[in-house]
């Protein structure tokens, strides 16, 4: 499947092209006019942040972000009552590619966006009495997520296992003795934040 991505180009231009195509498809599906879709597409794909992370070598992060609109496209197709098989296929393939790149921080935050959109759809469906449609669409999304998790499970499990031996140390969400941070493990906070932008 990843060979398909190389049609877009395995270099930096491929990331931008993928971002352009995915965002344009999403905005058209959302009902935007062509000029608005073109403007939104360029605003997303050609933002300064995209070029900063590519230039800084965060190519995996850029690829993961490029596929976010395509995942949302699959969800939108289900909500807009398009072909369920095609919508599930788009959602599953896009989510597979998104997770395949392995930038789990982006996936983590993107999951919050997807959950917020799903909760909005859930409330809307329950208010309008579309329970059967809600169950079918939820099932389609769940099947897609399960397929993607199973296909990526070796990578996800190995990442989890290696994370147990990370130099980043223990979670900051643990109890602190006398209100002071435990400096016996992990990176110094100043060092870690120096790499954030």
Description of each model-found segment:
Residues 148, 153-197:
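Periplasmic/ER-lumenal interhelical loops and adjacent helix-loop junctions
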Residues 9-10, 31, 128-129:
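Short, flexible coil/linker elements and helix-boundary hinge sites characteristic
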Residues 17-30, 35-124, 137-159:
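Membrane-embedded helix bundles of polyisoprenyl
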Residues 1-23, 42-65, 177-197:
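Membrane-interface coil-to-helix junctions
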Residues 73, 127-129, 177-179:
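Juxtamembrane/interface motifs at transmembrane-helix termini
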Residues 128-136:
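Hydrophobic, small-residue-rich membrane helices and short re-entrant helix-turn-helix hairpins
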């Amino acid at each position: 499947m990843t060979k398909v991505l190389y049609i877009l180009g395995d270099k930096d231009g491929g990331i931008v092209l993928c971002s352009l195509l995915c965002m344009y498809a999403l905005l058209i599906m959302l009902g935007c006019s062509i000029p608005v879709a073109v403007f939104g597409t360029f605003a997303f794909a050609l933002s300064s942040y995209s070029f900063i992370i590519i230039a800084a070598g965060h190519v995996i992060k850029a690829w993961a972000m490029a596929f976010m609109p395509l995942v949302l496209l699959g969800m939108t197709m289900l909500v807009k009552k398009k072909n369920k098989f095609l919508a599930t296929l788009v959602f599953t393939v896009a989510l597979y590619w998104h997770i395949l790149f392995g930038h789990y921080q982006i996936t983590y935050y993107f999951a919050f966006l997807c959950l917020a959109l799903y909760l909005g759809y859930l409330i809307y469906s329950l208010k309008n009495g579309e329970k059967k449609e809600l169950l079918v669409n939820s099932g389609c999304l769940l099947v897609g997520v399960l397929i993607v998790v199973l296909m990526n499970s070796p990578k996800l499990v190995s990442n989890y296992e290696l994370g147990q031996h990370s130099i980043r140390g223990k979670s900051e969400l643990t109890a602190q003795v006398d209100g002071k941070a435990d400096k016996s493990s992990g990176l110094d906070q100043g060092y870690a934040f120096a790499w954030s932008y």
